[in-house]
UniProtKB/Swiss-Prot annotation:
GO terms for molecular function: arginine-tRNA ligase activity; ATP binding. Monomer. This is Arginine--tRNA ligase. Signal peptide: none annotated. Coiled coil: none annotated. It comes from the Bacteria. It is an enzyme of class 6 (ligase). PANTHER family: ARGININE--TRNA LIGASE, CYTOPLASMIC, ARGINYL-TRNA SYNTHETASE. Keywords: Aminoacyl-tRNA synthetase, ATP-binding, Cytoplasm, Ligase, Nucleotide-binding, Protein biosynthesis. GO terms for biological process: arginyl-tRNA aminoacylation. A motif ('HIGH' region) lies at residues 127-137.
Length: 582
C-alpha cells in the first residue's frame, strides 16, 4: 500500500519539476506513515514540508500543488492537508475490497517478490562448541532465523552461516582431559553425554594442576600444527557438540542445519593470508610485538588511533582475523550483496572496526552492505542477566523443557478431556512458541525480562494469545462446514469494523518489507497482535455465521479466512507453528 502512495507522489514530483516549481536536482526520500487518528485518513506524508525550503514555497501551498498534480487513482478516495503541510490520504473502500479479494486467492497474500533479489549472508547463532547452548544463544538463533525466513519469503537468496566457535585455546584443555579419560580406559562418548559437566571437569583440572595446564597448552600447539591424533579427538568432540546444537535447533524450530555450519576452523588456512594481504597493502603496524591495523576513525581518550590486533606477539590469531577471513570468503565465494551479523550489542565496537579494516583492505566490495544487527540481554526478574536459581547460566534445553512442562499444566487445566498425545503436542507448541515469541516481540536492541508467567499468558502480546486467535477462526469455518480457502464471493465492506480489519490486512506486505530491511521481527509481532485485536473487534460487532444476508456472510467469512491465513503466514516467518485447536 505504501508503495502505491509513494508512486503517486513520485509522479506528482515529476510534474512539478517540469513546471519548474521544484528544482530538478531534488530527489526527496518519500516516507509514508500510518495515521494514528482515523479522522486524519489512513496514511500521511510530510513531502511538502521537506520540499518547501528548496522550492521556496509555503508548505501548505506546496501541499496543494502536490495534490493537484497527483494522477487520478482508484486507490485514494480523497486527500486533505493537515497542520503546517502534511498530506493525509483516505483509502477508497472499493480499492480495499479488490486488494482483499486478491490477497485471499494469492498464496503469498499479496506480499511482493523483490524486484532485484539479493544474495544475503546471515551469520547467526554461532555458539561456542566447548559448552552446551545456553540462554545467551537464544536471541541470535531465533531473531536471525526469523529474519532469514522473511528475506527468503521476499525472494532473496539467503545463505545461512553458523560461525561456531570450534577452535581456540580452550580446546587444548578439553583435549588434555579427553586424553586422561582415554588413559584411564573410560569411554569418551559417555563423558561427552553432558558437555557442561565435561567442560567443568576439564576446567577444574586446568585450574588445579600446572602439569595438566602445561599439557593443554602443548596440545593447542599440536592441534594447530595438524597433529592427526589431536585432530581426531577434536573432531569427536565437535561432532558430539554439534549434535547437541542440532537437537536444540530442532526443538526451537530454527532452520539451521549441519550444512550451514562453517566454523572458525574452516578459515585456519586463510588467517596467514589475511595478515600477508594487510601487510602488502601497508595497513599493518607493529605494536608491542603484535601486528595491528590502526584506524583513524577510532581513537582513545588521548586522541590516538585504536589498534585492531590481527596477530598476537606469540603468532596467535584473534577473532578479528577469522572474521576478516570469513568476510573475504562471503564476498568472493558466496558473492554476498548483504552480510548480516546477529551478534550481541556488546560486540558493536568490534564489528565497526573489523568492517572498516575489511573495506580499507578491499576484502569486500564498496556496494556490499555489512550490517551488525545487535541485540540486548535476556534479564532475570531480579534485573540481572538471566541465570538459574543456583546462579548458573541457564541451559537452553532446560528452559525449553520447563516451558513445555508449564504449558502442559495450562493446557490440561483448560482441556481435561483431551487425549494425552494431543495434550503433549499442544503443550510443546505452546511452550516453545511462548519462549520464542516473548523474545521476538521485543525490539531486539533492548534488554528484556524473561518471565514464564508473562510469556505463557493468554492475554496481551503473547504466543498463546495469537495461537488462540488462529484457532478461533478455524472453529468458525468448522462450524460453517466449509474449507478456509473455498469462499468465492467478493468482499463488500460496509461496516467500520470491516474496513478497519481490511485496512490492517493489506498492510502485511509493508510490514514484511520493514522486517526485511531493518532486521526487526518485533514489527511483525506487533502487526499480528494488532491484527488479532482488530479481528476480535470485528467478530463482536459483525456477526459472521448469523449475518443478515448470505452475501454478507460470505464476505465476512473471506475476511476471517484472510485473517487466519495472515496469522499463519506471519507466525511461520517467526518460526512458530499454528494449532488447529487448543
Amino acid at each position: 500500500m505504501k508503495v502505491h502512495i509513494q508512486q503517486l507522489l513520485e509522479q506528482a514530483i515529476v510534474c512539478l519539476i517540469k513546471q519548474e516549481i521544484i528544482p530538478a536536482d531534488i530527489q526527496p526520500r518519500i516516507n509514508i506513515d500510518r495515521t494514528k487518528d482515523k479522522s486524519h485518513g489512513d496514511y500521511a506524508n510530510n513531502l511538502a514540508l521537506m520540499l518547501a525550503k528548496p522550492a521556496k514555497q509555503n508548505p501548505r501551498h506546496l501541499a496543494e500543488l502536490i495534490i493537484a498534480n497527483i494522477p487520478e487513482s482508484t486507490l485514494v478516495i480523497k486527500m486533505e492537508i493537515a497542520g503546517p503541510g502534511f498530506i493525509n490520504f483516505f483509502i477508497n473502500p472499493n480499492f480495499l475490497e479488490k486488494q482483499i479479494d486478491g490477497a485471499y486467492l494469492d498464496k503469498r497474500l499479496n506480499v511482493q517478490i523483490e524486484a532485484n533479489p539479493q544474495t544475503i549472508v546471515i551469520d547467526y547463532s554461532s555458539p561456542n562448541l566447548a559448552k552446551e547452548m545456553h540462554v545467551g544463544h537464544l536471541r541470535s538463533s531465533i531473531i536471525g532465523d526469523a529474519v532469514a525466513r522473511t528475506l527468503e519469503f521476499k525472494g532473496n537468496n539467503v545463505v545461512r552461516q553458523n560461525h561456531v566457535g570450534d577452535w581456540g585455546t580452550q580446546f587444548g584443555m578439553l583435549l588434555a582431559y579427553m586424553e586422561e579419560l582415554r588413559a584411564k580406559g573410560e569411554p569418551i562418548e559417555n563423558n561427552l553425554a553432558n558437555l557442561e559437566i565435561f567442560y567443568r571437569a576439564a576446567k577444574g583440572r586446568f585450574d588445579e594442576s600446572e602439569d595438566f595446564a602445561t599439557r593443554a597448552r602443548h596440545l593447542v600447539v599440536k592441534l594447530q600444527g595438524g597433529n592427526k591424533d589431536c585432530l581426531k579427538l577434536w573432531a569427536k568432540f565437535n561432532e558430539t557438540s554439534l549434535s547437541h546444537c542440532q537437537e536444540t535447533y530442532q526443538r526451537l524450530g530454527v532452520s539451521l542445519t549441519r550444512a550451514d555450519v562453517r566454523g572458525e576452523s574452516s578459515y585456519n588456512d586463510q588467517l596467514a593470508v589475511v595478515v600477508e594481504d594487510l601487510d602488502k597493502q601497508g595497513l599493518l603496524q607493529q605494536s608491542q610485538g603484535a601486528k595491528c591495523v590502526f584506524l583513524d576513525n577510532f581513537k582513545n581518550k588521548e586522541g590516538d588511533p585504536l589498534p585492531v590486533i590481527i596477530q598476537k606477539k606469540d603468532g596467535g590469531f584473534l577473532y578479528a582475523t577469522s572474521d576478516l577471513a570469513a568476510m573475504r570468503y562471503r564476498q568472493n565465494e558466496l558473492n554476498a550483496d548483504r552480510i548480516l551479523y546477529f551478534v550481541d550489542a556488546r560486540q558493536g565496537l568490534h564489528f565497526q572496526q573489523v568492517f572498516e579494516v575489511a573495506r580499507s583492505a578491499g576484502f569486500v566490495n564498496e556496494k556490499t552492505s555489512l550490517e551488525h544487527m545487535p541485540f540486548g540481554t535476556v534479564m532475570g526478574e531480579d534485573g540481572r542477566p538471566f541465570k538459574t536459581r543456583s546462579g548458573a547460566v541457564a541451559k537452553l534445553a532446560d528452559l525449553l523443557t520447563e516451558a513445555e512442562v508449564r504449558a502442559y499444566e495450562l493446557v490440561k487445566e483448560k482441556n481435561k478431556e483431551m487425549s494425552e498425545p494431543e495434550l503433549r503436542h499442544i503443550a510443546s507448541v505452546v511452550g516453545i512458541s511462548s519462549v520464542k515469541y516473548a523474545d521476538l516481540s521485543k525490539n531486539r536492541t533492548s534488554d528484556y525480562t524473561f518471565s514464564f508467567d508473562s510469556m505463557l499468558s493468554f492475554e496481551g502480546n503473547t504466543a498463546p494469545y495469537l495461537l488462540y486467535a488462529y484457532t478461533r477462526v478455524v472453529s468458525i469455518f468448522n462450524k460453517a462446514g466449509i474449507e478456509m480457502g473455498s469462499v468465492t464471493a467478493a468482499v463488500s465492506l460496509t461496516q467500520e469494523k470491516e474496513i478497519d480489519l481490511a485496512n490492517k490486512l493489506i498492510q502485511f506486505n509493508d510490514i514484511i518489507d520493514q522486517v526485511a530491511k531493518q532486521g526487526m521481527p518485533h514489527f511483525l509481532c506487533s502487526y499480528l497482535f494488532e491484527l488479532a485485536g482488530l479481528f476480535s473487534s470485528f467478530y463482536e460487532a459483525c456477526p459472521i455465521l448469523i449475518a443478515e444476508t448470505e452475501t454478507q456472510k460470505q464476505s465476512r467469512l473471506k475476511l476471517a479466512g484472510l485473517t487466519a491465513k495472515t496469522l499463519k503466514q506471519g507466525l511461520s516467518l517467526l518460526g512458530i507453528n499454528t494449532l488447529e485447536r487448543m
